[in-house]
Swiss-Prot record:
Assigned protein family: Belongs to the peptidase S51 family.
Enzyme class: hydrolase
Active site: S155 (charge relay system), E173 (charge relay system), H197 (charge relay system)
Enzymatic reactions: [L-4-(L-arginin-2-N-yl)aspartate](n) + H2O = [L-4-(L-arginin-2-N-yl)aspartate](n-1) + L-4-(L-arginin-2-N-yl)aspartate
Disulphides: none
Protein name: Cyanophycinase
UniProt-listed SUPFAM superfamilies: Class I glutamine amidotransferase-like (SSF52317)
Length: 298
């Protein structure tokens, strides 16, 4: 069955009916926040406040993992100050730089007890190299799946969310195989391939290139100071100042990706594209889109 898609040109009665449907998906307490980088850390801090609230607000015990960064103490300290100012009950840094540290009973105990984990930006390959296939990652994965933990990742911390991960590449070019470097991510949301700093760095071409190589995955491009909040019921909702771009290959009919040279242009037929902004929703499994309630006239 083809997925249902909201056509914004629908008649008003249809839009009003969708308005009621929009109110149906209820946010569960915990969530996974995938942030496109450069989130507001000074003024309204909406995205960081949303993470703080989902992690327990004044009762939050937040653990910051700055393993992607070359300056983990500095970047971790910045987030500690932010969440302490918001009123978190406890905030700590787990400065994990080597895989052996993931065996530490103290580290594992912290992750079993905390209510929120924040993965900072930096280098996604460094982050995966430290955390993948470790007890630390297993604790995070199981607690997220069980609805016991709110997880956020920004920039590199967002890139690692899928099983197939964009490790690097170019920007602003015609889609081709050499435009994107792929690696294995942490698989927290295995159905997606995430790119970050998306429109800010002109990365549409490389996300399409990644999806052409893995047409069983959903491409998600997230702008700076923008967040895709993944709920446990399959819905994602957009927060922040930019947009979230969905590249959906569900109905893809043809790509030449397996047969062309690395620098030759790609052919990709029948991709579906959604551009979502504040309040819009998308269902990860049903491939359904719903507009923000505030955009529907009463």
């Amino acid at each position: 069955m083809a997925p249902k898609v909201v056509d914004r040109r629908n008649t008003m009665p249809q839009l009003q009916a969708k308005s009621l449907e929009m109110r149906t998906p209820q946010a569960t307490k915990t969530a996974v926040l995938v942030i496109g980088g450069a989130e507001d850390k000074v003024h309204g801090r909406e995205i960081l406040r949303t993470f703080f609230g989902r992690a327990g607000a004044s009762k939050a015990y937040i653990t910051i993992i700055p393993s992607a960064s070359r300056e983990p103490a500095i970047i971790g300290g910045r987030y500690i100050r932010i969440f302490e100012e918001m009123g978190a009950e406890k905030v700590e840094i787990l400065d994990i730089r080597e895989r052996e540290q993931c065996e530490s009973s103290q580290v594992k105990a912290s992750l079993e007890a905390c209510s929120g984990v924040f993965l900072t930006g930096g280098d996604q390959l460094r982050l995966c190299g430290v955390l993948s296939d470790t007890p630390v990652m297993e604790i995070i994965r199981q607690r997220v799946r069980g609805g016991q933990l709110t997880l956020a990742g920004t920039s590199a911390g967002a890139a690692v969310m899928g099983h197939h991960m964009i490790a690097g590449g170019g920007s602003g070019e015609t889609p081709n195989r050499s435009l994107v470097d792929m690696a294995t991510g942490l698989g927290l949301i295995p159905e997606v391939i995430v790119d970050q700093h998306f429109h800010n760095r002109n990365r549409m071409g490389r996300l399409i290139s990644a999806v052409a190589a893995h047409p069983d995955r959903l491409g998600i491009g997230i702008d700076e100071d923008t967040c895709a909040v993944f709920e446990r019921d399959g819905w994602l909702q957009v927060l922040g100042k930019g947009s979230v771009t969905i590249v959906d290959p569900t109905e893809l009919t043809h790509t030449n990706e397996p047969h062309v040279g690395a620098n030759e242009p790609l052919t990709v037929h029948n991709l579906r594209l959604h551009i979502l902004s504040y309040g819009d929703r998308f269902h990860l499994y049903q491939r359904t889109v719903l507009p923000a309630v505030h955009r529907i006239s009463s």
